[in-house]
Amino acid sequence: MAKITSLIGSGIVAATNQVGPHVKHIPAVGNLQKQIVSDQIQVRWSSTETSLKNDISATDVRGYKGHDMLAPFTAGWHSTDLEPLVIQKSEGSYVYDVNGKKYLDALAGLWCTSLGGNEPRLVAAATKQLNELAFYHSFWNRSTKPSLDLAKELLDLFTANKMAKAFFTNSGSEANDTQVKLVWYYNNALGRPDKKKFIARTKSYHGSTLISASLSGLPALHQQFDLPAPFVLHTDCPHFWRFHQPGETEEEFSTRLANNLENLILKEGPETIAAFIAEPVMGAGGVIPPPATYFEKVQAILKKYDILFIADEVICGFGRLGTMFGCEKYNIKPDLVSVAKALSSGYMPIGAVLVSPEVSDVIYSQSNKLGTFSHGFTYSGHPVSCAVALETLKIYKERNIIEQVNRISPKFQEGLKAFSDSPIIGEIRGTGLLHGTEFTDNKSPNDPFPPEWGIGAYFGARCEKHGVLVRVAGDNIMMSPPYILSLEEIDELIIKYGKALKDTENRVEELKSQKKIKSS
């Protein structure tokens, strides 16, 4: 994912090997960096659209290279050597940069603008709430009507398992951070002070705060941050194509991973393991759907040892997979749930934690004993964010967004999977409106391209050149387009993906020829 290795066009590429993902980060040097810079100039400043040019200020003309922002998940040389892609306007499934160049936003921002970029009802909901009550908090039994209404709506909407309470955050990272505090609070209340460890999975992404980055199973989030925290353990990534043994079926693979999970629990001591956290489909780690019977077997083990299940629905929630939540698709019955992103279609920062009755009853009793539940944020349940989220959920229902996703997703998935025979593609995978492409040589998970070639970064830059924005993580490409994508826009996406793929195939041939000449 771009968060873990590089933004599109970056010269930082990640190696993927048989042992684990994204373990090596190599700065672009020499011809690769020159190629990337050249591509960026060509992409960013060769606009074919003129709709915004009259609005460009002197600052825009001068450009933003060397800007003042410490940019998230961005290498320092990007800011000094490259012009950033500065987005100024959005219309439906498209965004426009400051020069008026138009891009199909195949990532929906960061997996979040499910209703596209300019849904007037969401703008109106925000404006109405700003005019009525721009802010009030939710501390000390004070609250606002939008936050109370949204809590009820979320509890009614989540049907995979009964939930009793909703706690509001500003992001998915904060939601997963909160989960750890809730679980510790819960076990302390039950007189289990040693039951504090968390198990997450290699290649998972759960956020970038101190705790949520620790939960994440991506080394780039840990390097030089003194992470992960010692109470976090990581078990196998359930990526069948990459990690299955010869002759092993998906069910057998799931059984092996479940056994490994149980062995880890027994090694650490079941009395020390508090919770297991998982995304229904792993998102930023490469779009990895679970193998057959995986969650069934994992849940049986968690129940056996009285370990809570936290479902991270930050990416999968609110229709992305063709069900309202990923838990419904994979028959997951969690004790706690994290949501964000499509909760407001990305229009306002908001996340939430859903808490089962079994956990919330204990928290209720403990807070009475202590005199308060001492956790919260200034903007927990922000009335404007909640008003926008309420309108978002209303639109999902009125427009039957689940039916819409299921109507367009087959064409989206099948159209992209038609490129599976490409000699540089190892695997194309996905479900609903989530897609992942992994580049490898010889179509094998054991034959990655040399990381210094930057194949994923090159493909991302060519997509950008052709007018599509995707996410790059090493040699993995990810897409999660808006739910409002039309069938014609899917055709456009597939055509431009194919053009970028052909460019990248040619680039690989060129690099292989250069390598052959050097070695001869």
UniProtKB/Swiss-Prot annotation:
Sites bearing N6-(pyridoxal phosphate)lysine, chain numbering: K341
A GO molecular function held by the record: adenosylmethionine-8-amino-7-oxononanoate transaminase activity
Pfam families (UniProt xref): Aminotran_3
Enzyme's top EC category: transferase
Reaction(s) the record says it catalyses: 4-aminobutanoate + pyruvate = succinate semialdehyde + L-alanine; 4-aminobutanoate + glyoxylate = succinate semialdehyde + glycine
Subcellular location as annotated: Plastid, Chloroplast
Main location: plastid
Keyword field contains Glycoprotein: no
Record's GO cellular component terms: chloroplast
Residues holding pyridoxal 5'-phosphate: G172, S173, D312
Positions of substrate binding: Y205, K341
UniProt keyword annotations, A-Z: Aminotransferase, Chloroplast, Plastid, Pyridoxal phosphate, Transferase, Transit peptide
SUPFAM superfamilies referenced in this protein's UniProt entry, alphabetically: PLP-dependent transferases (SSF53383)
Transit peptide residue numbers: 1-44
CDD domains: OAT_like
UniProt note on tissues of expression: Expressed in leaves, roots, stems, flowers and fruits.
Family under the similarity heading: Belongs to the class-III pyridoxal-phosphate-dependent aminotransferase family.
PANTHER family on file: ADENOSYLMETHIONINE-8-AMINO-7-OXONONANOATE AMINOTRANSFERASE, GAMMA AMINOBUTYRATE TRANSAMINASE 3, CHLOROPLASTIC
Designated name of the protein: Gamma aminobutyrate transaminase 3, chloroplastic
Organism: Solanum lycopersicum (Tomato)
Gene name linked to the record: GABA-TP3
